[in-house]
Design a protein with these regions (language model features):
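A generic local structural motif
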Residues: 143-144, 351, 457-458, 511-517
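Luminal/periplasmic acceptor-recognition loop/helix of membrane-associated glycosyltransferases
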Residues: 5-9, 461, 465-557
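Transmembrane helical bundles and short interhelical boundary loops of multi-pass, membrane-embedded
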Residues: 1-8, 251-254, 276-281, 288, ...
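Membrane-proximal, lumen/periplasm-facing interface regions of secretory-pathway glyco-
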Residues: 58, 92, 383-387, 418-464, ...
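Membrane-integral, polyisoprenol-dependent glycosyltransferases
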Residues: 1-272, 298-411
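Ser/Thr- (and often Asn-) enriched beta-sheet segments in non-cytosolic proteins
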Residues: 240-244, 359, 399, 417-423, ...
């Protein structure tokens, strides 16, 4: 699992940690306001830069998840509902899984509707949401412990590779990663500013429509935060009302979980919102032969190693070469942070009322998340090497970051030089990330983005506009949960289809098929497939074009 370069980073981080613990005293000095602002401003600028620069070209091509967001966003804008009879729904049913929440498509719809469907309009909303999560991370750190924690929390949110890479993925479930710190920041500040409770509870409820793991996390988190706000807040009625609003918004998600866990029939709520019965809903009381302790350990290990192996690093998908090393310094920081928080909890000192409330809210949400993952997480969550159940595990990333923040604050309090050394290590990590992200490694390794398919699909649409011939699209693009559905979404995205006519044209103007070696093409139709799929075909009478492993054949003119 560990490479030599990753072990070098781990060793440096551990050495800094031990030096800070054994030598201490000067960290009690506070940083000047000017320096603090300069560091925070630089972190935000760097974070925004790597999220937004070359957004339309890196990664090249399109993925099934990105296509799903773009196509359904355009469908929502043009028709008022999602494609293929889904209407307004709580879970897009193109394929089952954590990546098909409708929220990101809803956020993307105005961009696509007003400015047209392009990579910029489809990718920009999630990137902007991730930018908004950076000041929210600062606010959450400030609510938890003060300015020092706010600064470190901001640095992690802005520069940590996980937060950067997910901001560029345009996957529906990634929205939850950025909604959660925004929600907790608002709710934590709502203890002293009750008006902030309302948007905070609303955002927390919306996580259930980003990633289906929050079907189970969101209601308990809303209830816990509302109770804590009732106990610590100044105007208790605001806590009760805002909590009720959050739970009300959550009702459609609750019904979706009920339908799919009990086997009940799908329904339409108030004649408006479709509550779907999904064929492969993955959340179950799974691995029943495991003890609760074994499940908890598996979830914890998976959550920690998310920081190391997120984005399928082991399979070299999505992620630049050598990225494992960029995560390694997090391990000792999380360990030190956990010990520091435990020591503070047992020393008997009382925190200020506002900070005590914020800490209780984060702790309660973390506990709810762990419990939900143990009870309902995907089967992959129980794979202890942390390489599967990725999007389920992403629910824990915020709490990994909180532990890292606590560790960094401890180092700064102990020794300023060691804190500076850790900043330097983080800077090296981030510089390496930026070099690989924009220098070509990310481009070469993002092998679930298919630029060749995109180019050939657009070319097929040009030919069809001239001839009216039917386009047959291969469903064998990559091993997706539902390969043909993924291919269909990618084709509709690449051709910028009119969503008002797509359902009527399905099977007539275009069709997704499974290609075989012995298949012979119809003389009056267009075929888009992998080049190796049609190597044995008789192509007499057809013109042939190819791009990056994808072939287009069409009747010769």
């Amino acid at each position: 699992m560990f490479t030599m370069d990753s072990l070098v980073f781990l060793a440096i981080a551990v050495a800094i940690l031990f030096a800070a613990v054994q030598r201490g005293g000067d960290g009690a000095r506070t940083m000047s306001e000017k320096t603090h602002r300069a560091i925070c401003g630089a972190a935000i600028a760097a974070g925004v830069l790597v999220r937004l620069v070359r957004l339309t070209s890196l990664p090249a091509g399109i993925s099934a998840e990105e296509a799903l967001v773009g196509v359904q966003a355009k469908a929502l804008w043009q028709t008022g509902g999602f494609l293929f009879g889904q209407g307004l729904t709580t879970q897009l049913s193109q394929w089952a899984g954590e990546t098909t929440g409708p929220l990101l498509a809803m956020l993307t719809a105005p961009f696509v509707g007003l400015f047209g469907m392009s990579k910029l309009t489809v990718r920009l909303p999630l990137a902007l949401l991730s930018c908004a999560a950076m000041p929210a991370a600062y606010g959450l750190g400030e609510a938890l412990s003060g300015r020092r924690a706010a600064r470190w929390k901001l640095l992690i949110a802005a520069l940590c590779p996980i937060f950067v890479l997910e901001a560029r993925m345009t996957c529906g479930s990634c929205a939850a990663l950025y909604l959660l710190p925004i929600a907790l920041c608002l709710i934590a500040h709502g203890v002293t500013k009750p008006a902030a409770l309302y948007p905070g509870m609303i955002v927390l409820a919306l996580t259930a429509y980003a990633q289906d793991m929050y079907f189970f996390i969101a209601p308990a988190a809303i209830l816990a935060c509302a109770i804590i706000a009732l106990i610590f807040g100044r105007r208790k009625r605001h806590a009760a009302i805002s909590g009720a609003i959050g739970l009300l918004l959550y009702v459609p998600a609750m019904l979706t979980a009920f339908v799919n866990l009990t086997g009940a029939e799908g329904m339409t709520l108030l004649g408006l919102i479709r509550i779907p019965r999904l064929e492969g809903f993955e959340k179950t009381f799974m691995a029943e032969n495991w003890s609760v302790g074994d499940k908890l350990w598996a979830v914890l290990i998976g959550g920690v190693f998310q920081v190391l192996r997120h984005e399928n690093i082991h399979q070299a998908m999505y992620t630049p070469d050598g990225m494992l090393a960029l995560f390694m310094f997090s391990l000792p920081l999380m360990a030190l942070g956990a010990l520091a928080l435990f020591a503070r909890w047992t020393d008997g000192r009382r925190a200020a009322r506002e900070k005590a409330a914020a800490r209780a809210m984060v702790a309660a949400t973390g506990a709810v998340t762990l419990a939900a993952l143990v009870m309902f997480g995907s089967v992959g969550t129980l794979n202890t090497n942390g390489t599967t159940g990725l999007f389920d595990h992403s629910a824990l990333i915020l709490f990994d970051a909180v532990l890292m923040t606590a560790g960094l604050c401890t180092i700064e309090r102990k020794n300023l030089r060691c804190a500076a050394a850790m900043v330097a290590l983080m800077a090296v990590n981030f510089a390496w990330l930026a070099v690989q992200l924009f220098g070509g490694s990310y481009q070469a390794n993002a092998n679930v983005y298919f630029s060749g398919f995109e180019q050939m699909a657009a070319r097929a649409a040009e030919i069809q506009a001239e001839t009216g011939e039917k386009i047959n699209v291969t469903g064998n693009i990559y091993p997706h949960i539902q390969p043909s559905d993924g291919a269909e979404m990618m084709f509709l995205y690449a051709t910028d289809a009119d969503m008002r006519t797509v359902e009527a044209e399905r099977g007539t103007r275009y069709e997704t098929i499974y290609v075989s070696d012995d298949m012979q093409p119809e003389a009056d139709q267009i075929y888009l497939a992998r080049a190796d799929e049609i190597s044995n075909w008789d192509l007499e009478g057809f013109d042939y074009e190819e791009s990056e492993g994808y072939a287009l054949i069409y009747p010769a003119r």
